Design a protein with these regions (language model features):
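Active-site beta->alpha loop and helix N-cap motifs at the rims of alpha/beta catalytic domains
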Residues: 1-55
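Helix-coil boundary/capping segments in enzymes
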Residues: 1-2, 14, 95-98, 178
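Short glycine-/small-residue-rich flexible loop motifs, especially phosphate/cofactor-binding loops
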Residues: 4, 106, 167
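Generic secondary-structure boundary/loop-capping signal
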Residues: 19, 47, 69, 79, ...
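Glycine-rich tight-turn/loop motif centered on a GG-T
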Residues: 19-28, 137-140, 181-184
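Catalytic alpha/beta core domains of metabolic enzymes, predominantly
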Residues: 39-40, 51-159
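Conserved short secondary-structure transition element at the edge of the structured enzyme core
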Residues: 110-113, 152-184
Length: 184
């Protein structure tokens, strides 16, 4: 809550949050967590959906309750289940801007209703991915297919050592050392 309020004072356009990672268990816990953050500012709020950790049980009931929370204007959907993305889009319509959270599916997810993507590998390939997504949405499916197959090959190669790769890539590309991961 303090970080969300600080972000608002800094003039950001919106805030986001992962679900309660250490004390998960049910939809009520996730929705209470999101409500407290969303209600602490007037900023648009984009909760993360991380697989079954943040939408346990009935997805439609969860989305219905999520839409009742003030300032919720979208979601990041980190799932490989394209049917779930479509289902949420069909239920929420224009009430939620959906973002793909699975880098390896960002073109695929646009066909299911996402308006953009948020992910790890965009820190390195952001401009290329943005270009491909724009082209894909405008009908250049050949470019989308070719890029996605190559991008997925890279992701598959890097994934076992993703943090080491990302740390070195960020240092080489931006001269930013993002440091080692830390235990909670």
């Amino acid at each position: 809550i303090r970080l969300a309020q600080h972000a608002e004072k800094c003039g950001v356009d919106g805030i986001s949050s992962v679900p309660p990672i250490y004390y998960t268990g049910n939809a009520d816990t996730a929705l209470a967590h999101y409500s407290k953050i969303a209600e602490s500012t007037n900023l648009p709020f984009f909760p993360y959906q991380l697989g079954d950790n943040s939408i346990p049980g009935n997805v439609h009931a969860f989305v219905e309750r999520l839409l009742e929370i003030p300032n919720v204007t979208g979601m990041k959907l980190t799932t490989n289940q394209l049917l779930n993305i479509s289902s949420i889009h069909n239920q929420a319509g224009d009430k939620l801007k959906l973002f793909s959270g699975s880098d390896e599916l960002f073109c695929h997810a646009t066909l299911c209703g996402t308006v953009g993507a948020i992910g790890t590998f965009y820190n390195v390939w952001g401009e290329a991915c943005k270009h491909v997504m724009t082209e894909f949405v405008n009908g250049n499916y050949t470019l989308g297919k070719e890029f996605m197959l190559a991008f997925q090959e890279i992701i598959e190669l890097v994934l076992p050592n993703a943090w080491t790769f990302l740390r070195k890539a960020m240092l080489l590309k931006y001269r930013i050392d993002i440091g080692q991961t830390k235990e909670p």
